[in-house]
Amino acid sequence: MQVSRLKNKATALLVALLAYSLIFPAYIFALPQGGQVVAGQADITNPSAVNMQINQATQKAIINWQQFSIAAPEAVNFTQPNAAAIALNRVVGVDPSLIYGSLTANGGVWVINPAGILVGSTGVINVNSF
């Protein structure tokens, strides 16, 4: 009897967490995580808890990410050498990319994610090419 109650409570908690993540998806992730520059030169910094700055020093850069999502209050900004510069962002983790915040760049920003990319109703992408 006691085990049954524990299972019921655990199931109810799991269902509640799942429902919350479906209703409020923008609040279950943070700025892109685990960025590693594998080609070209770029510096990744977080000037604040809701801002990420990527300063790209070469025409082309490739960055591998564990996850690449941007929540509603968050912003990711790429500063590139010029409008023809390209940053290829490869997501190597298992989660889809959820863009509910702002992604800006003066050049091209490409995001490749085998799990998919969703731009939500509050998502803003302002780049030269995407």
What is each stretch, according to the model?
Residues V3-L6, Y20, P25-F130:
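Solvent-exposed adhesion/ligand-recognition segments of exported proteins
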Residues Q2-L14:
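Bacterial N-terminal signal peptides that target proteins for export
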